[in-house]
Regions:
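N-terminal Rossmann-like FAD-binding beta1-loop-alpha1 element of flavoenzymes
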Residues: 2-29
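Conserved Rossmann-like nucleotide-cofactor binding loop
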Residues: 12, 35, 203
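Active-site substrate-recognition segment that forms the wall
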Residues: 18-23, 80-84, 195-198, 202-332
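Dinucleotide-binding Rossmann-like beta1-alpha1 core, especially the glycine-rich loop
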Residues: 46-124
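C-terminal catalytic lobe of FAD-dependent flavoproteins
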Residues: 293-378
Length: 378
């Protein structure tokens, strides 16, 4: 079986490496700062698990497969990563086509859902102001994932199963030159393999400036955690689902989990961000906007103190679809990335797909190919 070097131990790279190992490959996984580190797109404590995506996309079925795989590995490792609080989509936008067209896709994929009118929502979650909400979707089997912990667990399982993990950086020198002659590492060594997978998130364009470059653009995303009133459990994951609010903007949140506070963020793509050296400090403008929203949608949280902030990045493509493709000049080099703010949940399923593509010499889904970009190098 082949030796595969995987660069990046996040939600994509870690799961790709583990599935390759389970498929019989010899695997070496590399990461510059370690799984779940604070610079990574997969860092932080939590990520949302949802399947509502609209029409004409592969992600609802991918999420359905991911749900099954998360459950499978939870049982195998005897650890919980998916917290099935439910996910509530609140539709306040005049254009509700995404949500309406999602209902058919959810049913086809076997995802449980409920279509809700304002009355039942108000009765079930009185802590939410549904004043302008027209209707909603509840995905009861979805919720949130433990992000950092699951990335670390995947790498631990890889090593326990006989795979190799090294915390080293990969030099960009020579990566675009065919034929591919291996990796130069930050410890001065070189690594040669039969196949190479680069699943290095916001750094993919830096390592492959000619092939990827600005096709994947890191954006700065501010995250806020607010403290609910003392003794008030209405804003914890025992009394409130994960939620998304589709209005003029799209905001989302995760109820206080692990006692870290009430997580709120604006999904609007932020400014360009340098993931290695960028200062991870939130802006007052974003905080003001989120506070105004919080006061309206969750009135009891109007004066809640800000108890924690975080800056992560999206690795954004122009169409928000992933990149899964061979390097156009080197058949044994795979490029995987472009999570675009919604990739984490899909890690187990995407890893399974990519591992099969490599081991069976398959062809990737055209929606993820580099050729979809007019400016892509051929």
């Amino acid at each position: 079986m082949p030796h595969v070097a995987v660069v990046g131990a996040g939600a994509f790279g870690g799961w790709i490496a583990l599935h390759l190992l389970e498929g019989g490959a010899h695997v070496t996984l590399l990461d510059a700062w370690g799984p779940g580190n604070s610079r990574a797109s997969s860092g932080g404590e939590t990520r949302i698990m949802r399947a509502t995506y609209g029409p004409d996309q592969p992600y609802t079925r991918l999420a359905a497969r991911a749900l099954r795989l998360w459950s499978k590995y939870e049982r195998r490792w005897k650890r919980q990563f998916l917290h099935r609080t439910g996910v509530l989509w609140m539709v306040s936008s005049r254009d509700d086509s995404l949500e309406r067209e999602s209902l058919t896709r959810l049913g086809e994929a076997g995802i449980a859902f409920q279509k809700l009118s304002p009355g039942p929502m108000k009765k079930r979650w009185p802590q939410i102001n549904f004043a302008d909400v027209r209707w909603g979707i509840l995905e009861p089997e979805c919720g949130y994932l433990d992000a950092r912990a699951s990335c670390q667990a995947v790498v631990a399982a890889l090593v326990a199963g006989g795979g190799s993990y090294r915390q080293v950086a990969v030099s960009a020198d020579g990566l675009e030159n065919a034929p591919f002659r291996g990796l130069t590492l930050s410890d001065g060594s070189r690594l040669k393999a039969d196949y190479y997978v680069f699943a290095c998130g916001a750094w993919l364009g830096k390592l492959f400036p000619e092939t990827v470059g600005d096709l994947i653009r890191p954006t700065k995303q501010d995250i806020f955690f607010f403290g609910p009133p003392a003794g008030d459990s209405r804003f914890t994951d025992t009394h409130l689902p994960v939620w998304g609010d589709h209005g003029k903007r799209f905001l989302y949140g995760i109820p206080g989990s692990g006692r870290r506070g009430f997580k709120v963020a604006d999904d609007t793509r932020g400014p360009a961000f340098e993931p290695t050296s960028g200062e991870r400090v939130v802006t007052q403008a974003t905080l003001k906007r989120v506070r105004e929203y919080l006061a309206f949608r969750f009135p009891a949280m109007k004066d809640a103190p800000l108890i924690e902030t975080r800056v992560c990045q999206y690795e954004q493509t122009a169409d928000s679809h992933f990149v899964v493709d061979r390097h156009p000049q080197m058949d044994n080099v795979w490029l995987v990335g472009g999570g675009s703010g919604h990739g984490f949940k899909h890690g187990p399923a995407l890893g399974e797909i990519v591992a099969e593509l490599i081991l069976r010499d398959g062809e990737p889904d055209r929606v993820w190919c580099l050729s979809r970009f007019p400016e892509a190098r051929s």
